[in-house]
A protein has these predicted regions:
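Exposed, interaction-prone regions of secreted/extracellular proteins
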Residues: 23-282
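Secretory targeting and sorting signals
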Residues: 1-24
Length: 282
């Protein structure tokens, strides 16, 4: 699926995201300001997990792009499942990239759940962190994107910094409702809950993406981003399982990414890996 659709959605005459749609989660307390967790999650993400809370609505005024960008400027590094799952969880490292302000440059590290709904349409929900040329003034931001709103949603309450490692969880408990959660301040923070025409299972992606503004072509640099502890939630229930070689997986052609100067290294197929600038030849 072309990730450029998301950037096009940002600029289709829409302002920054309206509050994320909540379904059966209004009873969650508001999340308090805190810091990135240094300990891994102790329970599955759920509105019934201990001290679960709901994030504030995405903050207005972070800015928006003003014209569509060409998909030719994209580089994708990662993998996707070829079977459907009920969710995905994992940890993403935050880095400071060379994204230029007031451009359509962006770097994003994210998980996605998606399904083809026919007639060329795809429904999806994604969550991760991003550094963009149009929002955040050079900061890295937690974000979500879904095909109900077709908008990037930035969560300014979470003060990220390079070196942070953040846990994210995307899953469904049924009824076509898919949720994105962030493990922050040692509790699960609900980012968004969306009723999507995906069903009880979806295809899963894990990617680091780089987009270079085609109107202002330049070479971007990307310090190595680590993705690890990636686990899949089985459709129909059961314990999470690590995304390993026994999971039917599709990876893209790495040649175009190397041409752009970006390399992917699998530490363990497919739950631990790095992506970033290719090593300089000696």
């Amino acid at each position: 699926m072309a990730r450029w659709c998301a950037l096009a959605g940002l600029v289709g005459g829409l302002a920054l995201a309206a509050p994320a749609a909540a379904h059966d989660t209004d009873r969650l307390p508001a999340c308090k300001t805190g810091k990135a967790s240094t300990k891994p999650p102790t329970t599955r993400a759920s509105d019934s997990s201990p001290e679960a809370c709901a994030s504030a609505a995405p903050a207005p005024g972070l800015g928006r792009a003003g014209a569509a960008a060409t998909p030719a400027g994209y580089h994708h590094l990662g993998a996707g499942t070829t079977n459907a799952w009920a969710g995905v969880t994992g940890r993403l490292a935050v880095v400071d990239s060379a994204v230029r302000r007031n451009t359509y440059d962006f770097v994003a590290s994210r998980f996605m759940v998606k399904r083809d709904t026919g007639k060329g349409r795809i429904a999806w929900l994604e969550a991760g962190w991003a550094e963009t040329g149009w929002a955040g003034n050079g900061r890295q931001l937690i974000y979500t994107f879904n095909t109900n709103t077709n908008q990037w949603q930035f969560y300014a309450q979470y003060q990220l910094k390079p070196g942070d490692r953040i846990w994210l969880d995307l899953h469904t408990d049924g009824n076509n409702v898919w949720q994105a959660w962030l493990w922050w301040n040692n509790r699960w923070n609900l980012l968004t809950s969306q009723r999507l025409p995906i069903g009880a299972s979806a295809y899963v992606e894990q990617y680091v993406e780089i987009h270079v503004d085609e109107a202002k072509a330049a070479r971007l640099t990307l310090p190595s981003v680590t993705v690890d502890n990636v686990q899949l939630r089985p459709a129909g229930g059961g314990r999470n399982r690590y995304w390993r070689e026994d999971v039917a997986t599709q990876t893209g052609n790495t040649s175009p990414q190397r041409t752009g100067g970006f390399c992917l290294k699998w530490v363990t197929h497919f739950d631990t890996w790095t992506a970033g600038d290719c090593p300089k030849p000696r």
